[in-house]
Amino acid sequence: MKQFESSLLHDKLKEYFGFSSFKGNQEAVIRNVLEGKDTFVLMPTGGGKSLCYQLPAMLMEGVAIVISPLIALMKNQVDAMRTFSADSGIAHFLNSSLNKTAVAQVRADVLSGKTKLLYFAPESLTKEDNVAFLHKIKVSFYAIDLSLIHISEPTRPEPIS
């Protein structure tokens, strides 16, 4: 994996996102992603989790696949990325809210190399056409953003006596 000096990471943070410094352990997490290491990130809401995969996606060859559970969250993330770039193709999502024409445009942007972040709902990854599409492209890494999923203990029905 390509090595990035701290000053270059800070320069790219400013260039792409307008921030002059990282929060908490973002820089260490980003370095791990850039080095191809499996990385688990647990941060509070507003802690900057998304940047931990967005900045590496901008710096690496290929497209980062982000698995996110909510269509609204995907749209917000894509809209936010598009505010940082003059190219609206920089980030896209593929989910059930898109018609065939929109899906074709997303795929064309990804295949052309414009797209650096592609968001999927988990269930979209079970569709054969999406799996086939992923085999055609260079994926830089996968990120699973489960920030809004609530995991609780399973409940069992009371036994009937």
Model-based region annotation:
Residues 34-35, 47-63, 80-82:
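Walker A/P-loop NTP-binding motif
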Residues 114-129, 141:
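ATP-hydrolysis module of ASCE/P-loop NTPase motor domains
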Residues 130-152:
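SF2 helicase catalytic motif II
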Residues 149-161:
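Single conserved hydrophobic/aromatic residue that forms the stacking wall/gate
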Residues 41, 65-66, 118-120, 142-144:
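Hydrophobic positions in the central parallel beta-sheet of the AAA+
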Residues 65, 71-120:
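Conserved nucleic-acid-binding Ia/Ib motif block in the N-terminal RecA-like helicase ATPase lobe
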